[in-house]
């Protein structure tokens, strides 16, 4: 009835039995690799694969991934077939009918380090290398990723942990070497809608002869990331060789970091942070610095808006984050400067990928008077980099930056970058909009960045490129009842309605204060 | 180009446009509800649904669920069709071709409470009601569930939080009222492989005339839960009315708690805890007590094995957990007793659903001499309940329990329970096994419960019912080199090989110490 078997003779035999024929089902499961197998498949029985099991899958290319099993109880698949989601199919570089092999994955050893962190133990470089390596290899499910990020937020990460995490994140991807210095870079810690200085700063620095190979993120919890905005102006999904060609040709670029595999786990972590709407200090520092170090940056300016509804709300929080950035950065050999900026209201007029792109174009085309705050912010940041990179004398950076805007050289540099990345294009405009009017006479007294950003997201940003908000007033603006305060833009009626419902449920996001002492 | 629209006129219009035709794809996505839509579907565009969006879905039955969107880029679906996973299909009670309506779900407001907990703020009853309610409604993704459990483990839950969580978990499901007292119950905090006393205790208590409507869990991180074991002896997936009928007829039952919707979020939380391999004190107390209170228990005995490789490792940890159980239990009106038991080695011989069932049958059939430790443990626990329930005088419970085993009344009560639940059946045996022999002469000095449990899981338990481990020696057993120490049992060669590889990579799980002073 039961029989005794010789284990040592098994592997070869198994390797042939565990093969199925690949079929592209065309199901896009986002970042998750999913495989579909018939519930009556002999391999499920033989290997004890249960529904939702994590399975190691390999094809003829010899690449292997960990995928989640979904069982199929109808005739969607023929016997002997295995269905693969788009992500699984593309990662394994399969062709229709290829043989696919399935085995149990090795146990997820780094999970014990995650558990230790949950219970408050710090993680060392080995732990973090193991965790980040397993994330990069796709071995962490959403459950594991969320636990790692939650534990990291729950127990404040030490300086050593953040530095080690940064290094782990750099080491698991490519690291660019430009064979020269300085390589300048900038980053904004975000939280301020519309603060889209990057394309302007890159254009100015490149116009001044500096090398600025900028990789940017998509939005984490905001209505637009720089990559989202830049994508409305030119292609941003360049691979490393294309990025290198652009930078060698024109001196700079503005591309999506995710496509060049610099700090590749960052985007995975960002997806989870977005779902949880958290972004801890340690994770933020590691995310930013790993990207910069991997991109080969030597000199970095960090724009840190501070304000009651910005990401960094108080001067104390700013000082803590600044200290972390400075300490980790200098420890890793990065020349780093932090500029605290005014985070009390959005910068520019637009909030959302395309709407912010229109503001960028205004500044570069000498229509900066329409968005004076964005113009000032961009020239200050660019000026700092011009000085750090010795393209301008100390104290004269901002002046040179302004000059490069006015004389059109920054615009020409930007055009050259867009052309080199695949061609300049005009940002889209939204088919639907709704104007929110001032409910009374008075002065704009407060603007809630967070709820404004939320409304922009409900309107469809950043996924709907043209969606978002346009501000028609800023802090201190004199308003007359019925005058446009801001407008919602969206690509669909459903989204417009959704954003509108949210606004209707909220107190004023832009507060109009009646003047106390009318003249 | 852009047009202004009247928002107030939209909803009715949208409700007709947002309808697709249901198609059962037969894809089993486990607990997750998934919907499949063509990437070119007009609703995706109109509503701004992105890949992996969470969408509120409803059918003609008026039930609504939150499902995850997967886009389909091939002709798997015709235009106008929507595919639904098995979970989504069954929850919505659809028929082929039914109209299905899609809208944006309301924002997940309870997520802000989860974030507060991540950053160390305690949760109150309102927060917990909101979180548990959203979990019960399927609004939490794996990412959210994992963050909630991780945060709860990272910041020790206060007594108040655990009590409130327990109540939230009770209130979100059914609560049974048996119209009489006492209603006795037992629970083991687990961590000790093979400790399958429950079926024996229920049989004894029912034989003594007590009412014991026992609901049990499936395994969390162990090779078998009581429900897994009981399922090899009789059906356990009874709904509440079937459970009630069984208890009214024979005085007790042993059913799977998940099927009767008592504390329904518990199984969802357990799935995540299993993936993370964590089980915090607070979560454990809430999980156990919510099930017992919902089941209508008035008197509860908790078996708490303590040992270096049990779930509770030290007397300090036991005291802490005991204090939590006692305080939360009495606060919620439960008469509760905790018995610390020896957790230094497995109880009985078998580890795994069916292998443990065979041990249970041995005790009930007066072959308890083969599993003396299981017999003693079960009669002590049953004795305590007999005394609490006033079926035995103080100090005489264990004696009566033994008598009911010996005179066959416990066995007859067990047979009656199995019959009432749908019929007794014999547990399966595994087609493959491998014996691990003693590497030397000596005495069994230590047994590592955790690694033994892990090996049993790698062999396929609990999903493969017949899989697991049989111990041929216990602590203190005299061994001769080559004598059987334990054996691996599995339903597939793949699993046997997998468990074997693990054992080969480990130091001895059962340590044989050479005798220092041979006589």
Swiss-Prot record, chains A, B:
Its EC number is 2.4.2.4. Keywords: Glycosyltransferase, Transferase. One of its GO terms (cellular component) is cytosol. SMART domains: PYNP_C (SM00941). GO terms for molecular function: 1,4-alpha-oligoglucan phosphorylase activity; thymidine phosphorylase activity. GO terms for biological process: pyrimidine nucleobase metabolic process; pyrimidine nucleoside metabolic process. Disulfide bonds: none annotated. It holds the Pfam family Glycos_trans_3N. It is an enzyme of class 2 (transferase). InterPro entries: Glycosyl_Trfase_fam3 (IPR000312), Glycosyl_Trfase_fam3_N_dom (IPR017459), Glycosyl_Trfase_fam3_N_dom_sf (IPR036320), Nuc_phospho_transferase (IPR035902), PYNP-like_C_sf (IPR036566), PYNP_C (IPR013102), Pyrmidine_PPase_CS (IPR017872), Thym_Pase_Put (IPR028579). It catalyses: thymidine + phosphate = 2-deoxy-alpha-D-ribose 1-phosphate + thymine. Belongs to the thymidine/pyrimidine-nucleoside phosphorylase family. Type 2 subfamily. This is Putative thymidine phosphorylase.
């Amino acid at each position: 009835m039961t029989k005794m078997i010789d284990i040592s003779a098994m592997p070869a035999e198994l390797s042939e039995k565990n093969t199925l024929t690949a079929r592209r089902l065309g199901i896009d499961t986002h970042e998750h690799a999913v495989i579909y197998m018939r519930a009556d498949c002999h391999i499920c029985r033989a290997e004890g694969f249960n529904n939702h099991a994590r399975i190691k899958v390999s094809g003829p290319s010899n690449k292997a991934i960990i995928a989640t099993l979904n069982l199929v109880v109808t005739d969607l698949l023929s016997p002997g077939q295995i269905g693969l989601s788009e992500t699984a199919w593309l990662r394994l570089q399969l062709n229709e009918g290829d043989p696919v092999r399935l085995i149990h994955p090795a146990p997820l050893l780094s999970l014990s380090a995650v558990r230790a962190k949950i219970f408050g133990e710090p993680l060392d470089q080995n732990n973090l290398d193991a965790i980040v390596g397993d994330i990069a290899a796709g071995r962490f499910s959403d459950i594991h990723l969320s636990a790692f990020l939650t534990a990291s937020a729950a127990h404040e990460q030490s300086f050593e942990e953040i530095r080690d995490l940064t290094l782990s994140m750099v080491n698991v991807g490519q690291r660019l070497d430009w064979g020269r210095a300085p390589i300048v870079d900038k980053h904004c810690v975000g939280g301020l809608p519309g603060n889209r200085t990057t394309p302007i700063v890159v254009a100015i620095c490149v116009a001044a002869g500096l090398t600025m190979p900028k990789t940017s993120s998509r939005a984490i919890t905001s209505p637009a990331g720089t990559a989202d905005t830049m994508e409305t102006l030119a292609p941003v999904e360049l691979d490393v060789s294309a990025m290198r060609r652009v930078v060698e040709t024109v001196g700079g670029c503005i591309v999506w970091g995710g496509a060049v595999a610099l700090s590749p786990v960052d985007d995975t972590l960002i997806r989870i942070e977005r779902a949880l709407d958290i972004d801890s200090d340690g994770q933020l520092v590691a995310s930013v610095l790993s990207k910069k170090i991997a991109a080969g940056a030597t000199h970095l300016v960090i724009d840190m808006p501070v304000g009651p509804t910005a990401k960094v709300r108080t001067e104390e929080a700013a000082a803590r984050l600044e200290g972390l950035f400075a300490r980790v950065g200098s420890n890793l050999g990065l020349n780093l400067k932090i500029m605290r900026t005014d985070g009390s209201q959005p910068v520019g007029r637009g909030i959302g990928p395309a709407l912010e792109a229109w503001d960028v174009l205004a500044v570069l085309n000498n229509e900066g008077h329409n968005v004076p705050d964005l113009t000032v912010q961009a020239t200050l940041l660019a000026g700092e980099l011009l000085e750090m990179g010795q393209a301008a004398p100390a104290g004269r950076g901002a002046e040179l930056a302004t000059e490069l805007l006015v004389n059109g050289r920054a615009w020409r540099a930007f055009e050259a970058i867009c052309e080199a990345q695949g061609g300049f294009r005009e940002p889209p405009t939204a088919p639907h909009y709704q104007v929110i009017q001032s409910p009374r006479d008075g002065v704009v007294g407060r603007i809630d960045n967070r709820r404004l950003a939320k409304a922009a997201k409900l309107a469809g940003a950043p996924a709907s490129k043209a969606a978002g908000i346009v501000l028609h007033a800023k802090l201190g603006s004199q308003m007359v009842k019925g005058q446009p305060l801001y407008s919602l833009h969206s690509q669909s009626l459903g989204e417009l309605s959704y954003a509108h419902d949210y606004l209707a449920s909220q107190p004023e996001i832009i507060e109009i204060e009646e003047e106390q002492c009318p003249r």
